[in-house]
Amino acid sequence: MYTRYSYKPSLGRTYVYDNKYYKNLGAVIKNAKRKKHEIEHEVEERTLDPLDKYLVAEDPFLGPGKNQKLTLFKEIRNVKPDTMKLVVNWSGKEFLRETWTRFMEDSFPIVNDQEIMDVFLVINMRPTRPNRCYRFLAQHALRCDPDYVPHEVIRIVEPSYVGSNNEYRISLAKRGGGCPVMNLHSEYTNSFEEFINRVIWENFYKPIVYVGTDSAEEEEILLEVSLVFKVKEFAPDAPLYTGPAY
């Protein structure tokens, strides 16, 4: 005999739902967003298809053009462990001293009809002591306030390891301007200091650079600091020589 409190099998029924008709709400939203992203990506790729016929250099330093090197100075600096030393400071007397140690390549004097497309500051670092095993570190800043006075020594905080050939290379080109620069020969011949101030720093950034090592001891480093000018190479309008062989 059943009462109102007794359990009746017919009162409660069990239903089995087929999962193929139900999907996770998160999966539905993610799938919709994924399809939308793929459609937008295809549209963007179609707009960039005309650029496939152009080639660009992954590293601008290795791109088209000729590199003209001007070595500014070679010096030996001592760097203590866990610190980085200021080696390039254009805002002070660093490059306005009377004793210039410039070493020019024979090909440097840039003629008037050549265009300068970019300028790189290149710092080559070499250990002076034999059988030393450490790596070089470097840090730089480009957009400094003209009145900013950098510290001579700083602690190592998130530095960059110097790559192959122990060479640290910085592009000094300003975004949206500064290139090309022409007619450098007369300025350079008249006064090198005026050439640096009026031509280079009017069109390119003034960097400050710190270098260091990951060594646990004080190290002696030979630094070679140079400016490398990327010169645009173009074919002349007329052949240089005329004769039977041409």
Curated annotation (Swiss-Prot):
- GO CC, alphabetical: viral occlusion body
Q: Which UniProt keywords apply?
A: Viral occlusion body
What is a GO molecular function of this protein? structural molecule activity
Q: Respond yes or no to whether keyword Lipid metabolism is given for this record.
A: no
Superkingdom of source:
Viruses
Q: Where along the sequence do coiled-coil regions lie?
A: none
User: What job does this protein perform?
Assistant: Major component of the virus occlusion bodies, which are large proteinaceous structures (polyhedra), that protect the virus from the outside environment for extended periods until they are ingested by insect larvae.
What family is it from?
Answer: Belongs to the polyhedrin family.
Task: Name the chain's protein.
Answer: Polyhedrin
Give the originating organism. Answer: Buzura suppressaria nuclear polyhedrosis virus
Q: Which gene encodes it?
A: PH
